Structures are given as structure tokens and as C-alpha cells.
Amino acid sequence: FGKWLENLQDWNLSRSRFWGTPLPIWRTENGAEEMCIDSVATLYAEIEKAVAAGIMASNPFADKGFVPGDYSAENYEKIDLHRPYVDDIVLVSPTGKPMYRETDLIDVWFDSGSMPYAQIHYPFENKDAFDNGELFPADFIAEGVDQTRGWFFTLHAIGTMVFGSPAFKAVVSNGLVLDKNGEKMSKRKGNAVDPFETIEKFGSDPLRWYMIWSSSPWDNLKYDHDGVAEVSRKFFSTLSNTYNFFAMYANVDGFTGDEPQIPLAERPEIDRWILSLLNTLVKTVTEEFDDYEPTRATRAV
């Protein structure tokens, strides 16, 4: 990733396609005047100017009852900012000339790189939580190593350009899930595993635990049904049986959890040992998670 950033090439943001996010740029036919629109409210206001100048017959947003500043889903369902509708909007330049939208779209990777802001509608909403560091930058990002040229890069590029900040503090780069022989799964080979059938058979928690327990996220995982079955039997069944044993005798003895606490020094040695072991485990698991080592954390458990 570092080498990729060191040898960075210019990023051509535009794409000559139909489907995607339109570039919010309007130009006069001679290209002498141009305008970049920063919000739907601004676009609405510029359309009103075009209507007043006689360039547009009416405001299509107003015709549909759209209200600027109302960020509800119901309000935004009234308009469509994609092609071909947005291309029908003709604005007016400061000198009174018609302005037509740049026909290109923005690269879809720019959409991905805008995720931290777009998903919370920043800066129009959630501005305080974002600006005070609560929502940005992210603590970590998790994706495949191929995203060094994709999502990892575009997030940083936009974050640096707009805020002078990296978009995330740490990276967990996922490996691939292979078959039990280390071969890439494919329908052609017949070695692909249906995740929904696996969840139906073993449950989602044993599958999750197996995947994170078997190998570190950045290593390739040799998936084996037998491994999930073993995790389900040795870990989850043991956990369930332990709880059921406790629950049965707690109910017999009328245990509620509200009983007075016995001071630690007055407890039997084996009780103190169990509590020490538990707290050591909590400390170990917390440290491993803080160090982005979930496999070590699960194996400690």
C-alpha cells in the first residue's frame, strides 16, 4: 500500500457512462462559464433562476412537491438525481447563457471513497458527531488485499483532499476462503460451499467462530465442514452444557444473584483461582482485540 501511494498516478474522476452518479457540473456551450453544484438545495435555487430567466419552463423539483431542507426519505423519493432526469435540467450562467450538465459520471470508486460522509449525509446532517472525531476517521477498515488500489486508496485520497486526514487508523486485510485442500472455490470445480446451507446446518455463531478461530483474518482459510462441526461440539456444546448445569442447580437452590457478596479474601482458594483465571482471560482477550488479533483472542477463550 505504501509503494502504491509513493508511485501514485493522477486519478481520472470522470467516466463516459450512463449508470452512476452524475457529475454536478454545468457549463455553457462555449465552456467559458461553469458551475459546480454543492447541494440539492443549491440546485433547486439555480433552477428557480433558470425559470425566472425563461430558460426552463418550470422547476421539476417544485412540480413534484419537493421541499429543500427536508431530508426525509418520503421527500427525496419525489425526485431522481440520476440520468436521464438530471440532464433535462438547464441552468443559467451569470451572463444569462444556458448551462448544460457535463455528460460524464463520476468514477464509482469516488462513491466508495465518499462512504464516511455520504452514509451519514455530512455536512447537512450529523455534522457535530463527525467534526468532533466520533465518526471520522474510522478505527479500522476490513477488506481484501486487492482493495489497496481501490477502497483503501479512495477513502484516503478523499479524506486527505477534503479534511487533511487519513480515513482510517488501521487495516485488517482479509485473506481468501479456500476449500479444505487449499484450492480456490468455484462452481466449475464443484468445491464451492453454500454459506446458507452451512448456517442452516450448524448455525451462524459456530461458523463465525470457526472462521475467526481457525486462522488469522489476513491468512487464507482452508474451509472444512468437519472443522465447523468440531467447533460446534467442543466449544458451543460445552458452553451450553455449562450454562444448563448452572441454571438447573441455581433454580433448585433458589439462586437469584441478589445474595450478599462474599469478600474475595474469605472465599475458598479454588474460587479465587477461578476468578483470577477469568480476569486474566478478560485482560488477554481485550489486549488481543485492541491489537487487532481476533484469532489469538478466540483461542485464548
Residue ranges and their predicted role:
Residues M248-I262:
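Intrinsic disorder at enzyme termini
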Residues Q261, A265, E269-R272, S276-T280:
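N-terminal accessory segments
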Residues F1-V252, I274-V301:
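Structured secondary-structure scaffolds
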